[in-house]
């Protein structure tokens, strides 16, 4: 959260004590160098008490305000303090902890998915369902393809395209413009960046902000554990909890935000673009048109999933590296910009010294803090990195275009088929739910597990891209097995004529399989959590 602590003349780095003495109680330049140790002691005592410098300093903002201007606050804008409001103890829902040395656009995408993704998926599905009903009721025109589907197009490729179109538009609009009202702490908004005196008081009250927060969101990247300030925030948050209270820490790797969006884009391209092409190919061509369609779909899958697999392998490598780094973490190894730049600001005040003095107040000595990082904090990181980034609900949200495509098929069946159209439509809906909630998540889990297993780079750099083929072919194999199983479920005649019962049978196979795999295996790495006397979430 470095920019929140910077005077206008300082570089945008992680500085807790930059000119704080001057901002709170200015002193003559000739005496500034004579009292840095006393000033550092004073600042450390104030920060260590975890109380606000004044009642009006403790402020929060709404999560949606950070998204204004397409993440203007994440880019370090300093004129957003007016978006904050005064709050009270434990009234801040979440403290956002992040490194300003990480990618801004990755953080923006990750936050959008974290806060807006579920709402966007729900609204998009409702909108696509309404569009499907309107098309089935002949209130919407045929958007694309032949006017008479029954004469010019095989029934297996009937699509209305309305559900996918409406769903995609609503999802994008909700993702970008939905404004969640959750109260959060974000440095450049909650700490005044213009008024030096108020800025100094805000810096002095950073412990109070942490103590007033019910949970912490860590936007994790490769630079996070290398920075003194970010690790100090985590330690201070754990220290601020009441005796016996389980700290609530939520970790979101910023590298995975774009990855989930790419997965969704891949699914949209495979289903929507390929369906559009199939309407033209299959209504005009014969013979080899199916092979052209399959080749196009495979090409789209190959490009999208290859990038995803590469990103997953990079993420799993960073998780392994961070686990090793935290296991031997030492204060002497983390970076502090004021030391890197030779203390050119602040009249000799040193961020590192202030932080170290606070740590000694809270943990007794530096060795105790390092031990806690190597045990409790490392266990927290490992627990969150292995559990949260690949939950079933997150994968389902990323695969929601599958449902839109089958809603398009259902609406086309309801409109054009002659024999019990609504029964045929219900069959397509059941089929869509099975693929969306069952087959898709299982294929994703297999891809992630193999990416984790083969995370290390090949010693021969030219062969490394070939490793990405293993998860890709595994996904193709899972889809092939699902298609075979689906066809086998079509064979028996169950309770009623039609295929709805058969699709429910197919769903009865794949849905429990997906739930069991995510419940007992998981798509993330199963990392070893060390035994510690400290409690972890």
Model segments located where?
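The feature represents the membrane-entry module of six-transmembrane cation channels
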Residues: 3-537
């Amino acid at each position: 959260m470095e920019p929140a602590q910077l005077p206008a003349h300082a570089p945008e780095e992680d500085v807790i004590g930059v000119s704080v003495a001057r901002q709170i109680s200015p002193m003559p330049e000739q005496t500034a160098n004579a009292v840095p140790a006393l000033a550092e002691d004073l600042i450390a005592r104030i920060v260590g008490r975890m109380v606000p410098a004044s009642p009006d300093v403790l402020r929060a903002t709404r999560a949606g305000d950070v998204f204004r201007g397409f993440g203007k606050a994440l880019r370090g804008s300093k004129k957003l303090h007016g978006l904050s409001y005064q709050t009270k103890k434990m009234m801040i829902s979440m403290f956002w902890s992040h490194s300003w040395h990480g990618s801004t656009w990755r953080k923006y995408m990750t936050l959008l998915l974290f806060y807006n993704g579920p709402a966007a998926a729900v609204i998009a599905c409702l909108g696509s369902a309404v569009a499907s009903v309107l098309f089935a009721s002949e209130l919407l025109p045929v958007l694309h393809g032949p006017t008479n589907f029954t004469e010019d197009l095989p029934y297996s490729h009937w699509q209305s395209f309305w559900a996918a179109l409406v769903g995609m538009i609503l999802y994008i609009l909700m993702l970008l413009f939905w404004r969640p009202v959750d109260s959060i702490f974000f440095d450049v908004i909650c700490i005044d960046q213009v008024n030096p005196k108020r800025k100094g008081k805000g810096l002095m009250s950073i412990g109070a902000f942490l103590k007033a927060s019910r949970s912490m969101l860590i936007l994790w990247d490769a630079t996070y554990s290398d920075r003194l300030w970010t690790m100090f925030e985590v330690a201070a948050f754990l220290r601020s909890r009441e005796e016996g209270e389980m700290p609530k820490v939520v970790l979101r790797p910023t590298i995975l935000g774009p990855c989930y969006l790419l997965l969704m884009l891949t699914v949209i391209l495979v289903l929507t673009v390929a369906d559009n092409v199939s309407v033209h190919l299959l209504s005009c061509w014969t013979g080899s048109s199916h092979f052209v369609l399959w080749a196009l779909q495979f090409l789209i899958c190959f490009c999208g999933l290859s990038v995803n697999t590469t990103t997953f392998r990079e993420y799993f490598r960073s998780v392994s590296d961070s686990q090793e780094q935290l296991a031997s973490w030492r204060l002497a190894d983390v970076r502090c910009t004021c030391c890197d730049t030779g203390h050119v600001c602040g009249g000799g005040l040193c961020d590192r010294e202030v932080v170290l003095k606070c740590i000694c107040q809270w943990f007794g000595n530096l060795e105790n803090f390092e031990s806690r990082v190597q045990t409790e904090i490392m266990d927290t990181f490992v627990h969150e990195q292995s559990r949260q980034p690949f939950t079933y609900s997150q994968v389902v949200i990323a695969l929601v275009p599958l449902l839109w495509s089958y809603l398009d098929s259902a609406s086309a069946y309801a409109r054009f088929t002659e024999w019990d159209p609504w029964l045929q439509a219900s069959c397509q809906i059941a089929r869509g739910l099975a693929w969306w909630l069952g087959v898709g998540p299982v294929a994703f889990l297999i891809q992630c597990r193999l990416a984790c297993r083969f995370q290390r780079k090949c010693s021969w750099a030219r062969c490394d891209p070939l490793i990405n083929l293993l998860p890709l072919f595994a996904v193709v194999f899972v889809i092939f097995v699902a298609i075979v199983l689906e066809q086998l479920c079509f064979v028996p005649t169950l309770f009623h004529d039609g295929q709805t019962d058969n699709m429910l049978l197919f769903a009865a196979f794949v849905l429990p399989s997906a739930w069991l795999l995510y419940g007992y295996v998981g798509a993330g790495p199963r990392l070893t959590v060390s035994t510690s006397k400290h409690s972890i979430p």
